[in-house]
Amino acid sequence: MRKAKPKKRVILPDPVFNDQKVSKFVNHLMYDGKKNTSYEIFYAALETVKAKLPNEEKTALEIWKKALDNVTPQVEVKSRRVGGATFQVPTEIRPDRKESISMKNLILFARKRGGKSMADKLAAEIMDAFNEQGGAFKRKEDMHRMAEANRAFAHFRF
């Protein structure tokens, strides 16, 4: 066990939208400390989203936030061992973990898409998530389905 709980690091807002959520997303997107490249990919993806949805009254940032909300899980299952048997126990997810999972899933499924540049793949995944489709949305639905199937074990609290 550690002595004290580690302090939360302050994440500075991004330069364009002045939003902490964007900075956090870019940090997840980043490889090898190349944050500028990550920002370029993210902003290019938002430009692509705006170009492909011209008649949408929302801004590209609002579309991205809605897409993130659509892929954010509310419950997850955790393994709990009780008397020799392992149960999948559904548990609520902390708000900061919800955000982190949704960002990581969106990026993971964007990377899994074939071909094109990362900006295009990310834009496509954002649009799919906005329309409640795509891999990241399916992952969230699967998590909820697993939790629902194992609802009988919800009384095994952690």
From Swiss-Prot:
**Keyword GTP-binding on entry:** no
Query: Which keywords fit this entry according to its UniProt record?
Result: Ribonucleoprotein, Ribosomal protein, RNA-binding, rRNA-binding, tRNA-binding
Q: Which GO terms describe its cellular component?
A: small ribosomal subunit
Spell out the Pfam families in the cross-references: Ribosomal_S7
Instruction: Please give the InterPro entries that the UniProt record associates with this protein.
Output: Ribosomal_uS7, Ribosomal_uS7_bac/org-type, Ribosomal_uS7_dom, Ribosomal_uS7_dom_sf
Q: Name one GO molecular function term.
A: rRNA binding
Mention one GO biological process in which this protein takes part, according to its record: translation
Q: Does the keyword rRNA-binding apply?
A: yes
Question: Which HAMAP family does its entry note?
Answer: Ribosomal_uS7_B
Q: Briefly, what is this protein's role?
A: One of the primary rRNA binding proteins, it binds directly to 16S rRNA where it nucleates assembly of the head domain of the 30S subunit. Is located at the subunit interface close to the decoding center, probably blocks exit of the E-site tRNA.
The family assignment reads: Belongs to the universal ribosomal protein uS7 family.
| Subunit architecture | Part of the 30S ribosomal subunit. Contacts proteins S9 and S11.
Q: What is this protein called?
A: Small ribosomal subunit protein uS7
